[in-house]
Amino acid sequence: MPLEKIPAILLIVLGMHIALTAPTPPTPKSQRRFGDGPVGINWLGGGINLIKANTIATSQIQLKQLTSIKAGYWTCAVAELCIIVAGTMESDSAWSKRVVALLLPNGKHPYCIRLTPTTTLATILVVSGAVIRYWCFREMGRYFTFHITILENHKLVMTGPYSIVRHPSYAGTILMAVGQVIWYTAPGSWLREGIIYQIKLAWLLIIPVILCMFLGLANTPRRMMAEDAMLKKEFGKEWDKWAKAVPYRLFPGIH
């Protein structure tokens, strides 16, 4: 029965919403000890030197863009929930017929929106990634921002997930991105079963999601190196000791 997919849908959309919502308000420039935005890396001279990145391309996605991306996730979730509910109603229900005709223009039965082993795997990946990111939010507190910076009275956080790898929030992001690709392209998903990708208007929702995942994954290595360089510059030997104790950046024993 499609009803069993409802918990998975809610877990996916709530996990993505929480993980993509900044845990702290934007930090005033006066409280930032390093720059007012993203940080780049200058490799000249064989060393890593921090440079302000206000004039270079960066991977920072503005909060307004994240809001539109989250709206896309919620739209897909609500669409699937409506289809599932419509499928449980009497076949002569006018509301059910309208919903199915609108959201499944190819004429498929509402039961096509279902939980499968593939979407179950996707749920596990997305929820795991979201939990990791939320753990990072809680562990870092006010130091976790959606921009790379050093705050006043900044402390080096080395506990919780940061005692396992140095950049656990990015590990969570990668798990979520992989899970999303599987979730939205697997059999049983609305985008696939309803052939929604053939509707031009639907790409207003699809493109921001794809762009978010691509930019996030493509720029993760540079952001990690920038953060390591910035923290090393700020904390010196304390960071060296932590990096020696926690040598992996993303996944223990792998990277």
What are these regions (language model features)?
Residues 1-158, 175-255:
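Membrane-anchoring alpha-helices and their flanking helix-loop junctions
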